[in-house]
């Protein structure tokens, strides 16, 4: 789907079986970054944001490991990459209510150091959405003047939001950020909620 990109996977070494790590390392376009430490204090959902500070990285796209790629995402990303906009946001389901979904955005390299910002910001140990809180409160204002936003719902920015290249109905109501479930019934529940969003 993204042949010019390398997939960086951040793993908590004590929690992931060595066999899994070894299997992932067999892919030539995959880089494994092993992390350690307490999962509460280390804030693992933020690890993936560190990539944009790497000197070899010009463009970073943050995705959840348990979500699928669909062509509607690919088309939207292509539109952004061809533009002069620095930051890309996607919201494609009624449940995508955050300004920036942690696994549905992209950013081009600028002078901004994300790691420095993350080190400065205190995150509540109890919240499960600390990554999206950081993105909304710290990152969003910094890139506010250079956004491309593909949004099917929650168009907070009004006319600045643009539609995805084609309708959900053309893809059986699949959506960007859709999770991978072994039980297709759960997938159907999510798509039914998407359909209700149009009613």
Where are these regions (language model features)?
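Preference for well-ordered, secondary-structure-rich cores of eukaryotic proteins
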Residues: 8, 12-14, 55-58, 74-85
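A short acidic, amphipathic alpha-helical/loop segment
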Residues: 19-23, 51, 73-77
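N-terminal anchoring/stem segment of glycosyltransferases
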Residues: 1-38
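Short aromatic/hydrophobic "clamp" motif used to bind/position activated sugar donors
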Residues: 60-62
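A short, glycine-/small-residue-rich helix N-cap motif at loop->alpha-helix starts
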Residues: 39-47
